[in-house]
Amino acid sequence: MVALLAPNPDLVDQVHLLALTLGGQNEGDVGPRGEGFYGGYFRDPDGNKLCVYCRT
């Protein structure tokens, strides 16, 4: 799995939404996950799993 670090939660939301709009599949809704972590998971059209996240 590839993890992409974003500078803020707004960009995490935007990237996750864009990935789904472009044909990706949701693998985990965007939101807080434990202390200091905000992220979401998706698979690209080729099936690769990615995470976009930021530290909060």
Language-model-detected regions and their locations in the chain:
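Vicinal oxygen chelate
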Residues: V2-P45
